[in-house]
Amino acid sequence: MGNRAVRKWKKTRMVTAMLAVCSIFFGIIVGCKVKSNEKSEMLPIITIGTDQFEPYNYLDSKGNNVGVDVELATEAFKRLGYEPRFCVISWEDKEQLLSDEAIDCIWACYTMTGREDKYQWAGPYLYSRQMIVVRSDHDIWKFDDLEGKRIAVQATTKAEDLFLHRIESDLPTVSQVNCFSATEDMFAAIRKNYVDAIAGHEAMLRKFVDDGEGAYRMLEESPYRSALGVAFRKGTHAEL
């Protein structure tokens, strides 16, 4: 990604963050485990379950959490008098961790669409498209070319639901839907030709495509557009 593109992306990211913070998170924390009106020199901590992938949440060279979701969460909870603590979780365990109160919320480029009744949501704060990435040397250009192919997705995501046809779309029937825990694992699989295509959030995949120096390309079609939100345990934030 060139310097101009990076600057433009950062500017857009900050504008989006401020708009989202001002319009969504006013008063959302009533009912959390730690009361925000406690008088203490230390801010009460809210634990955020997250998954690491750029540009939403990742570690910089100093080991600090940075990214779109990190900036949004930090600013939102700062205004509400909380100190966010980011906890990288196993994505497959997110619901159990939330239920057990090991985390207070899930903030990780998490899709609200189709899960509206499953959690107490704050959002949407951004929108995302599900996209498909293939190797540049593969003859796959449109959805129909995916018929009978092997697909890599991240476990328990919308991409998995789409290719297992739990969600209606124009995608054809494929021969395999291989579920991985991390984006890096999916790209390792396609690099070794274990799978023919990868499906997932556009921004997440775009970073790997851009860093791939021409090894990968993204199909033009999108099978699904989704709203992103912050998930709390149902019944804990009735004022939303």
What label would you give each PLM region?
Residues 38-110, 117, 178-179:
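Extracytoplasmic small-molecule ligand-binding "clamshell" domains
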Residues 46-52, 66, 144-160:
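Short loop->beta-strand "edge-of-pocket" segments that line small-molecule binding or catalytic clefts
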Residues 50-52, 126-134, 202, 206-240:
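Periplasmic-binding protein-like
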Residues 58-61, 73-82, 159-180, 209-214:
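Ligand-binding cleft/hinge of the Venus flytrap
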Residues 76, 98-99, 146, 190-191, ...:
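Hydrophobic residues within well-ordered alpha-helices
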Residues 93-96, 109-118, 162-166, 189-224:
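A ligand-binding cleft/hinge motif common to bilobed small-molecule-binding domains
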Residues 123, 134-151, 235:
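Flexible hinge/capping segments at coil-to-helix
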